[in-house]
Amino acid sequence: MATKVVLDFEKPLFELEEKLNEMRVCLKQSSGEHNLSETESLSREIEVLESKVDALRHAIYKNLTRWQKVQLARHPERPFTLDYIYMMMQDFVELSGDRHYGDDKALIGGFARIEDEERDFSQTVMVIGHQKGRDTKSNLYRNFGMSQPEGYRKALRLMKLAEKFNKPVVTLIDTPGAYPGIKAEELGQAEAIARNLFEMAGLRVPVICVIIGEGASGGAIGIGVGNRILMAENAWYSVISPESCSSILWRSWKFKEQAAEALKLTAEDLLEQKIVDRIIPEPLGGAHHDPEKMADTVKSLLVEELRMLLEKNPDDLVNERIEKFAAMGVWNEEE
């Protein structure tokens, strides 16, 4: 049985839950022994402890710092792109290769169908997303979700294919960054990302980008130019990770918490700055506490957004996308 991953700020809650579980076991044993007084006493203690657990759970997860949200976004049990695809969509057909160099397993994509009988909605989409692994072997296979140039070129090939068949594009963003290796630079990492930004801006089909976990720098925005940008409540999106920011500014990773605060990288921060359009609420404690509920929420919002975007003509889609990104940022003009 896999060991449960407990983050540092979750330890007090985990310890209390362990104590609660032990008491429930004792209650079960006590009930079997027909010890009525002991059973009643344990039941009362359990009720009190359950209230404490609920109160502590809300106190922790409703008051997360920016750094704690970064930690949740990186949680190894969090649902990844393929999890969302199989929970939200049907008939997924993965397409491989960039037709130039090779196939990148850190960035996957293909046609799939989103169906929602309650809303009378059915639509084939091109879904593209970063894919991480859950253990050492799969992480090496997926390169820890860090895409190579061939991954971004594959993504662009699939987007152009979607445009050819007039199908919307849905991207799922979850990466610690584009792969920074020498080989990636030799193969044109910067050019591949820049080309995607240019081409995505002009796609004549609806494009929806969903930040489901980590959204680091060019690795994220390489598939992140959309008409609508949705962001999970405990995801992060920034030009740099808190650790890298800390190492540049303070020559040490020790100041990552301060860096996270300064970067303003949470969904709330980015909604306020009008960089993202909607925040996707997560189950209390993070998406990994109820992946199916999280996938249902994402699917519901995708259906809502797709229905609206599919009514727009291609020229409006392109113009709105360009205007959206041109309006981002804050600057001053001196006379």
Swiss-Prot record:
It is found in: Cytoplasm. Keywords: ATP-binding, Cytoplasm, Fatty acid biosynthesis, Fatty acid metabolism, Lipid biosynthesis, Lipid metabolism, Nucleotide-binding, Transferase. Residues 48-308 form the CoA carboxyltransferase C-terminal domain. InterPro entries: Acetyl_CoA_COase_a_su, ClpP/crotonase-like_dom_sf, COA_CT_C. It is an enzyme of class 2 (transferase). SUPFAM superfamilies: ClpP/crotonase. It comes from the Bacteria. GO terms for molecular function: acetyl-CoA carboxylase activity; ATP binding; carboxyl- or carbamoyltransferase activity. One of its GO terms (cellular component) is acetyl-CoA carboxylase complex. It catalyses: N(6)-carboxybiotinyl-L-lysyl-[protein] + acetyl-CoA = N(6)-biotinyl-L-lysyl-[protein] + malonyl-CoA. Pfam families: ACCA. One of its GO terms (biological process) is fatty acid biosynthetic process. Gene3D superfamilies: 2-enoyl-CoA Hydratase, Chain A, domain 1 (3.90.226.10). Its EC number is 2.1.3.15. Pathway: Lipid metabolism; malonyl-CoA biosynthesis; malonyl-CoA from acetyl-CoA: step 1/1. HAMAP family: AcetylCoA_CT_alpha. Belongs to the AccA family. Component of the acetyl coenzyme A carboxylase (ACC) complex. First, biotin carboxylase catalyzes the carboxylation of biotin on its carrier protein (BCCP) and then the CO(2) group is transferred by the carboxyltransferase to acetyl-CoA to form malonyl-CoA. Acetyl-CoA carboxylase is a heterohexamer composed of biotin carboxyl carrier protein (AccB), biotin carboxylase (AccC) and two subunits each of ACCase subunit alpha (AccA) and ACCase subunit beta (AccD). This is Acetyl-coenzyme A carboxylase carboxyl transferase subunit alpha. It comes from Chlorobium phaeobacteroides (strain BS1). The lineage of its organism: Bacteria, Pseudomonadati, Chlorobiota, Chlorobiia, Chlorobiales.
